[in-house]
Design a protein with these regions (language model features):
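N-terminal secretory signal peptides and thylakoid transit peptides that target proteins
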Residues: 1-17
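Terminal accessory/anchoring regions of large secretory-pathway or extracellular enzymes
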Residues: 31-76, 83-85, 353-534
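Solvent-exposed N-terminal domain segments of exported/luminal and surface proteins
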Residues: 59-199
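A contiguous, surface-exposed recognition patch within enzymatic or periplasmic domains that forms
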Residues: 77, 170-172, 177, 264, ...
Length: 534
């Protein structure tokens, strides 16, 4: 799998167009010969489905067309000179609180997409015009094609302030999109679809959205609907995104896929994030080696899952030395997400990037996804500019031509997400040699002590008598040597310590949770360990 170097890019894109003035309707512009023509009849999800079915019958146009020379070779510094003019924003006519800006083609974004805008099912495509952008010091040719298209778009809304215009959601590159809740800053991304992610043959395929229809509904609507047409060599698809802004903005997603050819590994509702440094893998990534003052660097710090039996599983993320893939049986899955639990500035010490404000994306199926696994892929990275974490639901049955796939889900942009359940939750994961400092006990290189801090739920009740607690553990390719629990008053919770002897050349899979008698008190902590990582 290829890492996606886009951290610097996406951070800079948020500055390409700030503030929105009085909106102008693009529908009134003269399109001219060759411009995309408006679709005057009422248009909806079924129309996108029909287009995806027709598209499936034809070969994929995998290679994007050549851009005009002035845009073909743009580096980042030149590309970011191209800024959308705020006064040209769309959707605001008629009093809507939503507004739309388009991204220009260039740099890494060379595949044009068509963006249609409208209300209540009546759409018109946005024609390309140099009037939409400020090009900085770039010298443009006298004529550019009116059907050039755009790289993507973003929608603004008064998310944090009734009089403001904050970025709500962005679609840019392949099938990537990101959205925000109140007082959040962009971090991880979602994708429309993942194909063959995590395979060692590096044969991952990146589907792309080729056309969008954005419906702001009426002026009083607090929802914007986005239809999207997906394409790739292996599959086509129709998507509907109903976006509702709020403290924890949500998106209801409906999908229908039409495979062109077999796909071995299909990833539904994929999430992509970055994890470079954290407290649980400092033995792997010595900050001194990177000359790094920040204690932690990550957009997400764990994978959270809710099983069919309402067990909550927390898997801390790590930056491994080599690619690692872990799969969790997930028949009847009720939810999963990549979370940024640690919301403390002190953990990151970054006054510009504010990792403590990165959102957590939580996915809940709203249809039957059938049998499958939640797959977590962790790639090695040497800095924070590369996305190295992928999580998705992978159905047990492969994708086959002639077999349509339909599914739906809800996505929410949360904070820490610890209030999703009322149990104790994992606060931190640490590791150390499995012996006390200065102890005469011999050191076994295959033995390691894992320490897990649990807080919340009813754990503070047991602070004065932790003997009432039992530690449930599980191990694969490893043996639990000893386990014990001690109070941690600093978090009003408990610290569980597990000494584990691992098998040579195998990945040890561990699990731990706290209970009192028959009553489970915490979510289940899960982890994968390679002894040669030490």
């Amino acid at each position: 799998m290829t890492t996606l170097n886009r951290r610097r890019l996406m951070t800079g894109l948020s500055a390409l167009a700030t503030g929105l003035g009085a909106a102008q309707s693009m529908h009134a512009q003269a399109a001219g010969p060759g411009a995309p023509q408006p679709d005057r009849r009422r248009f909806g999800f079924n129309d996108v489905v029909a287009r995806a079915q027709r598209l499936m019958s034809n070969p994929s146009e995998a290679t994007p067309p050549q851009l005009p020379q002035v845009f073909e070779g743009l580096d980042w510094d030149k590309y970011r000179q191209i800024r959308f003019r705020p006064e040209k924003a769309l959707l605001r006519s008629g009093g809507s609180r939503f507004s739309l800006q388009v991204f220009h083609l260039g740099y890494l974004f060379k595949r044009p997409v068509t963006v249609n805008v409208g209300r209540e099912g009546t759409f018109a495509p946005i024609p390309y015009s140099t009037d939409l952008f400020d090009y900085g010091s770039l010298s443009l040719p006298k004529r550019l094609p009116i059907d050039l298209g755009f790289a993507g778009f973003r929608i603004h809304y008064p998310l944090n302030d009734p009089k403001g215009n904050d970025e709500l959601i962005s679609f840019l590159g392949s099938s990537y999109f990101r959205w925000l809740g109140r007082d959040q800053k962009y971090g991880l991304s979602a994708r429309g679809l993942a194909l063959n992610t995590g395979k060692l043959d590096n044969n991952e395929e990146f589907p792309f959205f080729r056309e969008f229809w954005v419906d702001a509904h009426d002026a009083k609507s607090e929802m914007v609907t986005i239809y999207a047409l997906l394409d790739s060599p292996s599959v086509t698809g129709a998507y509907q995104f109903d976006v509702r802004p709020g403290q924890y903005s949500s998106i209801d997603v409906s999908v229908r896929l039409f495979p062109r050819r077999p796909v071995e590994r299909l990833g539904l509702a994929p999430l992509t994030s970055m994890y470079f440094l954290g407290e649980n893998d400092r033995h792997l990534n010595d900050r001194n080696r990177y000359d790094e003052f920040r204690p932690e660097l990550h957009d997400s710090d764990g994978l959270l899952m809710r099983t069919a039996t309402d067990e909550w599983i927390w898997r801390p993320l790590k930056n491994p030395l080599v690619q690692e893939v872990q799969r969790y049986e997930a028949k009847g899955l009720k939810g999963f997400g990549l979370m940024q639990r640690d919301r403390r500035f002190e953990s990151y010490q970054d006054i510009e990037l504010n990792y403590e404000q990165r959102p957590s994306y939580w996915i809940e199926p709203t249809s039957d996804w059938g049998d499958g696994v939640v797959e977590l892929v962790e790639l090695a990275t040497k800095d924070e500019t590369a996305d190295n974490i992928v999580a998705a639901f992978v159905p047990k049955a492969p994708l086959e031509p002639g077999k349509e796939v339909s599914f739906s889900y809800r996505m929410r942009s949360l904070g820490s997400g610890v209030d999703l359940h009322g149990h104790g939750h994992v606060v931190g994961t640490f590791s150390a040699p499995a012996r006390a400092l200065g102890s005469a006990e011999s050191h076994n290189e295959l033995t390691r002590r894992l320490m897990i801090d649990f807080a919340g739920g009813d754990l503070d009740y047991f602070l004065q008598d932790p003997s009432l607690l039992q530690v449930d553990t599980a191990a694969q390719n490893a043996a639990i040597v000893r386990k014990f629990v001690v109070p941690n008053p600093a978090i009003k919770g408990m610290r569980v310590m597990i000494d584990v002897q691992f098998e040579k050349d195998k990945v040890g899979i561990l699990g731990a949770a706290l209970r009192s008698g028959s009553r489970m008190l915490t979510e289940t902590w899960s982890y994968a360990w390679r002894f040669y990582d030490v």
